[in-house]
Amino acid sequence: MAASAARGAAALRRSINQPVAFVRRIPWTAASSQLKEHFAQFGHVRRCILPFDKETGFHRGLGWVQFSSEEGLRNALQQENHIIDGVKVQVHTRRPKLPQTSDDEKKDF
């Protein structure tokens, strides 16, 4: 199960131009199906990724929701309160990764 979540997260990261929301503070009682059901009210959801902790077997309380359209993502971001399993979760746009700097570049003195 963890391997399939890792493959799904990797595929999601590769789809740079896809509309993806980053969701934090997901209650440990919530499943990806609940996440998909909640966000489907804003637009068609292609997939939801909840990475699991190998040691505990529970998801890590964060995840990604990939929409089929930018409109779905915008609709979700415009909603102020997202409640899943009685808990208010935080929804953000996926931020592009910044280029890594080497240790030599960090030492600017």
UniProtKB/Swiss-Prot annotation:
The modification Phosphothreonine is found at T101. Ubiquitously expressed, with highest level in heart, liver, skeletal muscle and testis. One of its GO terms (molecular function) is RNA binding. Its main location: mitochondrion. The keyword Cytoplasm does not apply. It comes from the Eukaryota. One of its GO terms (cellular component) is mitochondrial matrix. It is found in: Mitochondrion; Nucleus. Residues 19-103 form the RRM domain. Keywords: Mitochondrion, Nucleus, Phosphoprotein, Repressor, RNA-binding, Transcription, Transcription regulation, Transit peptide. Changing R7A: Impairs corepressor activity. GO terms for biological process: flagellated sperm motility; mitochondrion organization; negative regulation of mitochondrial RNA catabolic process; single fertilization; spermatid development. The modification Phosphoserine is found at S15, S102. RNA-binding protein that acts as a nuclear receptor corepressor. Probably acts by binding the SRA RNA, and repressing the SRA-mediated nuclear receptor coactivation. Binds the STR7 loop of SRA RNA. Also able to repress glucocorticoid (GR), androgen (AR), thyroid (TR) and VDR-mediated transactivation. This is SRA stem-loop-interacting RNA-binding protein, mitochondrial. It comes from Homo sapiens. The gene is SLIRP.
